[in-house]
């Protein structure tokens, strides 16, 4: 199957810069702002956005990761280990503005699982969602507050995000 590049390295960098600015506008600065990246690529994107916000505001926004494995609705007996915190961050996120970062927004089920994981133990002031790519085909009433690129796709197509931290290149492709 051939690969069609939708975003190259430069486009990804511009997109991250724009999303960082949009998050700052949404929150009116960095006060009480926390970024949580969904493992794996969302976590790397969250750190890139953190770096960009730091370069804009000279403020290091607390950033962590969220592992939704035990909150997925396609896994049997999810609740058995759901009592453990699914996120790794060194600040209390109660009464904070949390922005969840994901690489590709598709059906909405990953985001629903991340909301379940967060709300099981904490009560943020507000939760926002940033996605590098929104490919449509939602199964749940979920939308991103910050979208890098809307990419209309067929259900049988695959959108892949490659990040140099784990893939040795930066690109978004349709396969």
UniProtKB/Swiss-Prot annotation:
One GO process term, biological-process aspect: DNA-templated transcription termination
EC numbers: 2.4.2.9
UniProt xrefs under SUPFAM superfamilies: PRTase-like (SSF53271)
InterPro entries with a match to the protein in the record: PRibTrfase_dom, PRTase-like, PyrR, PyrR_bifunctional
Subunit structure: Homodimer and homohexamer; in equilibrium.
Family classification: Belongs to the purine/pyrimidine phosphoribosyltransferase family. PyrR subfamily.
PANTHER family recorded: BIFUNCTIONAL PROTEIN PYRR
Listed name of the protein: Bifunctional protein PyrR
Species of origin: Staphylococcus epidermidis (strain ATCC 12228 / FDA PCI 1200)
